[in-house]
Amino acid sequence: MSRPALRIAGIALASLAAFVPRPAGAEADHVIVLPPFLVEEQETKPWLNRPIWSHGEAGNIEILSACPEDETQLFIEGLRTQRMELGQIIPDEFLLHTALPTTFILFPQSLKSTMDADLTREWERLPAASAAHDRLRPLDDLRLTDPDSSYLFVILNDAKWKETKRGSEFIFSPSYLRFLLEARTPALPAWFCEGATHFYESILIPWDKNGFEPDPWLSKDAASVLHEDAFAPRPFLPLRELFIPALPAGRTEQYRHVWNAQAELFIRWALSGKVPGGRDRLWRFAAAAAVQPVTEELFKSCFGMDYDDARNALSDYLPQAVWEPLKGPSAPSSDIPPMALHDATPSEIHRIKGEWGRRVLSIVKEYNPEAVPIYSSQTRQLLQGSFDRGDRDPRLVASLALFRLDTENSNGARELLEASPAARSARPLAVLELASLRLAEALDAPSGSNARLSEGQASGILECVAASLGKKPAIEGAYVIAATVARHLGREPSDSERARLNEGAHLFPQNSELVFQSAAWDLRAGAVAEARRLIEMGLWEATNPSARLKLLDLEAVGPLGTGW
């Protein structure tokens, strides 16, 4: 019996609307929440007097819009402006960048009832709908993310949009900013992601004139006390506890509350002008903390003061922070020309709608599996139908292969990917899934001596891994596959193979097993210094006691145990 392939894909979900799954045993009349449903429709509607969909792609943004061109261009302008404004407090390299453009599907509020009616009609045809008497509520805005790309569905309020002439508040909402920070590799420290997100929540629009609201601290009452008495007692953590990679289990809710508030205060203090060059110092410190353990020496090299002095400075700044707004940096000038839009081709429409349908399928499977036939049928019609009509756009072929994997057709997925080098090149996720399929087959029938993988089997897998590397963001699964191959070969990894594994361990130090294996291979190869660096970072990041114990045991053996 063949073993299942290791799946790389993991859809990350975010929505402005509360995504309310139906609990097991829910009573009748429970509200069913389903993702936006995009049908394969005709390309024009006479009463609109225009093609339904327009398309544009520039830089790292792709647009498929059912909105009029002026609204679409206003959205794009707002999106670009917000990204530049955000860069004044958070550098662009701290945000997620993906190999593929971020795709936005824009839909006008005025046409939403038509889309919802399509979904309702399909839902009511299902036996489960009539039996359960469920009420349907389609979602509005939704973000779905694969390791190599993001798709966002945005409903534009036609009337409000023309009134405000400003970018959508959804685009860089605090939750979206948190996602962009936390999904970046190597991972930024938790205190930075938490503090920057909470600080961003205090932004006042337009922020270049109004800046940021005063620090909310622990509560309005706690802030009021400090406003009236700057010397009033306040809970404050030592900075060595603030800069840990993650809060340990067992901490009280009050401790977490103080930790979150102090992380925000630290970001605000660094950007307040109280520290000369504070913004650059903060960025330098956060970047360093993403790739090495945080020590007081590291902090001092960035801020020019030790932990005690910085803690005192933070505490002294707090009474001012809770009553005084923080001035925002000057907004950058924007002279980016409008994106070139054109009537979307059938290939573009089917590719983007089909990929959207593939992504929402995983959510529907988890929360409302009875609705899977609606989405799988529509997605198959969009992707397979377009393929059958001769469309060989590499991204569409890659999406079709991933859809086949998602619907338990691994043989069909592999057939597509093996036959289409262009599809493998178009999406890192697709070529990694092929690596996973080859690995599963090789482990099921190893052709090397002593039930080990042969060099030929390993080469076929690792060439797919190599094709995915060097693109943003790095995908953890690529290094996990490479490590699995190394474990099942009848030899030690070569220097170049170890370098690739070490790269993965440095990028994903939270993966204690990857760190452990890479450090062990380094030790056996005599690369003691590299093993030491990996173990130090692994111990800094490890939260699981057994994982820490394995790393400590490795540290105690061989050259590390006697040569430090």
Feature locations, PLM:
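Bacterial N-terminal signal peptides that target proteins for export
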Residues: 1-10
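Canonical positions in the second alpha-helix
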Residues: 385-386, 419-420, 467-468, 503-504, ...
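Residue at a conserved register position within TPR or TPR-like alpha-solenoid repeats
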Residues: 200, 404, 438, 445, ...
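Beta/coil-rich, acidic/histidine-enriched accessory regions frequently appended to metallopeptidases
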Residues: 28-29, 34, 291-446, 460, ...
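Acidic/His/Gly-enriched intrinsically disordered linker/tail segments
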Residues: 49, 129-156, 167, 184-341
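Bacterial N-terminal signal peptides
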Residues: 9-18
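Juxtacatalytic substrate-recognition/specificity segment
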Residues: 27-43, 47-193, 204-207, 244-245, ...
